Design a protein with these regions (language model features):
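Cap/insert and terminal regions of metallo-dependent hydrolase folds
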Residues: 186-187, 196-198, 204-304
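Flexible, glycine- and charge-enriched loops at secondary-structure boundaries
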Residues: 9, 89, 240-243
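Positively charged n-region of N-terminal signal peptides that target proteins for export
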Residues: 1-6
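Ser/Thr-centric signal marking residues that sit
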Residues: 35, 86, 203-204, 265
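Binuclear metal-dependent hydrolase catalytic cores
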Residues: 23-197, 277, 284-313
Length: 316
């Protein structure tokens, strides 16, 4: 009888432990793989974000070194088979070949087509990449005796406003934003277990971001900053900034949407002479934001990670 009681106690303890693990499994982990721009900046790879929720590992945009950054993050790359593109600018897609092809190399972890979502042109992009790497793909397939050949193909889907993916309790919604033209740029909302994350993508001030981000747990928003004198003296800088959300505008978005935590990624800073890769410009940008927004906001850094549960916690 005593042994039976002890066994029952151990079972209860084990079940409690499993409950705690399941609660932990109910969170969303967000890792900023790249927070930069097209500029060559060793401190900031170009834009990419990794979302881990339950059994899903989803990448949003694949900037420079996205796959290497994903490896550094400690994510389960065996589950990385889905890439969502906000738009088709080079700094958001330049890492696709690495993400796509590395999944087939030994030790290979993908035997099914690589799934890709994006705006108009995404199917042409996938077809072009497949053609560009056709010689390499053929050699790899022969090396592995024809096994997993499907893993070298793309399954590309053009997105529109609305749900674009749903599996294992994870929902991904795309919403159009204004960056450089109509129907060419999107943001994403990711929902899982009652938690939510919004990625603005590259955008100017857009009411659609506000619509989808109201009350969100974590809002990852891009920002573009140049001093007034730079905008006045350099037309190129002014045109570039016209495609991005200014600090005061982002502060307004944060004020209206009231996320539990706001984070900056894809941080564009210019002086009148050109790109400013120093921290000085970033600090000035943050000062402008804090003039009108006093809520929690973080200047994102590469490989910074957040856990979205009952609260939003910065992990590193």
């Amino acid at each position: 009888m005593r042994a039976l009681k002890i066994s029952l106690i151990l079972v209860v303890i084990a079940l409690q432990g499993m409950g705690e693990l399941m609660a932990q499994d109910g969170v969303i982990k967000v890792t900023l793989l790249g927070t930069g721009t097209p500029q060559l900046n060793p401190a900031r790879m170009s834009y990419s974000t990794l979302i881990e929720a339950g059994d899903e590992v989803l990448m949003f945009d694949a900037g420079r070194a996205a796959m290497l950054q994903a490896k550094k993050s400690g994510a389960n790359l065996k589950k990385l088979n889905k890439l969502f593109l906000t738009h088709l600018h080079s700094d958001h897609v330049i890492g696709i070949p690495d993400v796509w092809l590395t999944g087939f190399l030994a030790p290979a972890f993908r035997a099914t087509p690589f799934q890709l979502w994006g705006p108009a042109g995404v199917k042409n992009l996938a077809a072009g990449l497949r053609q560009a790497y056709d010689f390499d793909v053929g050699i790899r397939i022969k090396q592995y005796g024809g096994k997993r050949a499907e893993g070298m193909e793309f399954d590309a889907t053009q997105i529109h406003d609305g749900y674009v993916y749903e599996s294992n309790g994870v929902k991904v919604t795309a919403f159009e934003v204004h960056h450089t033209g109509p129907n060419s740029a999107y943001g994403y909302k990711i929902e899982y277990n009652g938690r939510s994350v919004v990625l603005s993508g590259d955008t100017t001030y857009d009411e659609n971001v506000i619509k989808y981000a109201k009350g969100v747990d974590l809002l990852v928003h891009q920002v573009g900053y140049a001093p007034e004198e730079a905008l006045a003296k350099n037309q190129v800088v002014a045109r570039i900034m016209s495609h991005h959300t200014q600090p005061k505008q982002v502060a307004k978005i944060f004020t209206v949407t009231q996320p539990k935590l706001a984070v900056f990624s894809h941080i564009v800073v210019f002086t009148e002479k050109g790109p400013d890769l120093s921290s000085d410009g970033e600090e000035k940008m943050m000062e402008v934001v804090r003039q009108t927004y006093d809520g929690p906001v973080v200047l994102g850094q590469d490989l910074m990670a957040f856990e979205v549960g009952d609260t939003v916690t910065q992990l590193q």
